Amino acid sequence: MPRLFFRQLISVVLLLVATRPASAIEVRVSAQALERTLRTQLFNGQQGRYYIRGDVTSACYVYAESPHVTFVQDRIVVHVHAKAKFGTAVHGACIGVSLTTDADVSLIPEAEEESVGFRDARIEHLSESKELNFLLVPFLSRKLPAQMKVNAAVLMRQLLSRSTETTGYALSLGSLKLHSLLVEGDVLVMDADAALKVD
């Protein structure tokens, strides 16, 4: 009788463990991975540029290019190179002034359900030109953080969709809930609960 009870108890425990909705995981993300995401989602125009004003055919324009992501203390720092031609377009040429600068914005990563978000955008470095800064500040403090946001569940599902070909097992992600995102040295550490299925 005690042996039968023990087997039933183990069966119930195993069933409960197997049906738990999610288990804790830790994912470590490099600065280069965030930089690739930024290039894919925002700096995807010709020559890797994002036009803040005008476009590739405009005589007068403002664009940012060459994003570089690093980690400093608890923040993610995005460095961009910006170039502008301010003036009046006359016969396909911009009559005015050309400006070039480097700019930096730092952000704090934030867990948002399934997504990696960013808050507290802080401009660390801007140009000396008030005209250029007038366009760079909204780009750096609002547009860039919004475009860096990544749905981690979608990315993980895309990665797992080819698991049968690469491992012989069909892996799938049922759910993902991000709890925290912290910069630790040269990585962004993501703590989450995830439910994975293996067939």
PLM features: residue spans?
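Extracellular/lumenal and peripheral-membrane lipid-interaction modules
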Residues: 23-199
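Bacterial N-terminal signal peptides that target proteins for export
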Residues: 1-10
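Cleavable N-terminal signal peptides
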Residues: 11-12, 22
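N-terminal signal peptide c-region/cleavage motif recognized by signal peptidases
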Residues: 18-19
